[in-house]
């Protein structure tokens, strides 16, 4: 039996070879055989990333995607033992290394973030919402779906085909991603800043229509503000971004 420290040394050598392709002889291991093992592991990594980033995989040229995933696999030491979190580390790798493709594809960071957040929201633990009813209750606060994230983006990766996005599209964009509890589907909602303010307020506690209206009145006359807020609420109830109205006590739904 080999000493424990020797075994660990060989394990590190094997792990380093799997990442970099630089082979250090390991007793009892043939390089041609371990090469197949490395390819198998890399294919699993690449497959996981392609599954998480279908839009990014589609917009990059095949050789660009191969080079990106190979460089990530070779030079980045993943911190999480959970495979589903690996795509987050690819996003962070591109962000932190100022990866060269970001010059050719200025929207790349936003696209990676958008696709990763879809995975993250899908995989997040269940969050118990504030007690609510779908019945209409006068003056009751609206209840936000707690399984949500709101992103601030520079490019409209949620609105346009990535291949059609140019530097002229750069601006300020907001999008929310939420999970529908019945189906587990991830739905996204394009937003403007007043919508984001509404979501931020509802994230703290249920708030009624008249209180939320104060936000919209900062941007539009009263009639226009009322109509815009009501339209947003109706659409959000339909998509389950909003779940209903808060139940304060049992008499609220009688």
Model-derived features: positions:
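Long, charge-rich, low-complexity alpha-helical segments
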Residues: 1-133, 189-254
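Short connector loops at helix/strand junctions that flank enzyme active sites
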Residues: 85, 143-145, 171
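Low-complexity, glycine/alanine/valine/leucine- and proline-rich hydrophobic stretches
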Residues: 148-204
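A glycine-rich beta-turn/hairpin centered on an aromatic-Pro dipeptide
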Residues: 118-165
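Generic preference for hydrophobic/aromatic residues in regular secondary structure cores
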Residues: 14, 141-144, 150, 176, ...
């Amino acid at each position: 039996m080999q000493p424990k420290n020797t075994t660990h040394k060989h394990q590190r050598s094997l792990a380093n070879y799997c990442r970099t392709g630089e082979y250090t002889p390991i007793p009892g291991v043939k390089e041609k055989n371990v090469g197949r093992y490395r390819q198998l592991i890399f294919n699993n990594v690449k497959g996981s990333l392609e599954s998480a980033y279908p839009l990014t995989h589609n917009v990059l040229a095949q050789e660009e995607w191969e080079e990106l995933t190979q460089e990530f696999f070779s030079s980045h030491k993943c911190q999480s033992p959970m495979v589903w979190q690996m795509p987050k580390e690819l996003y962070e790798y591109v962000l932190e290394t100022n990866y060269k493709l970001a010059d050719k594809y200025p929207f790349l960071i936003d696209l990676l973030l958008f696709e990763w957040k879809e995975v993250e929201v899908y995989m997040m633990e269940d969050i118990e919402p504030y007690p609510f009813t779908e019945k209409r209750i006068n003056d009751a606060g609206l209840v936000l779906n707690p399984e949500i994230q709101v992103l601030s983006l520079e490019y409209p990766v949620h609105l346009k085909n990535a291949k059609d996005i140019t530097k002229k599209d750069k601006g300020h964009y907001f999008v929310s991603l939420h999970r529908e509890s019945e189906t587990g589907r991830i739905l996204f909602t394009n937003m403007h800043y007043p919508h984001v303010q509404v979501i931020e307020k509802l994230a703290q506690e249920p708030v009624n229509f008249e209180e939320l209206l104060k936000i919209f009145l900062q941007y539009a006359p009263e009639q226009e503000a009322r109509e815009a807020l009501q339209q947003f609420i109706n659409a959000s109830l339909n998509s389950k971004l909003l779940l209903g109205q808060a139940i304060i006590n049992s008499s609220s739904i009688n």
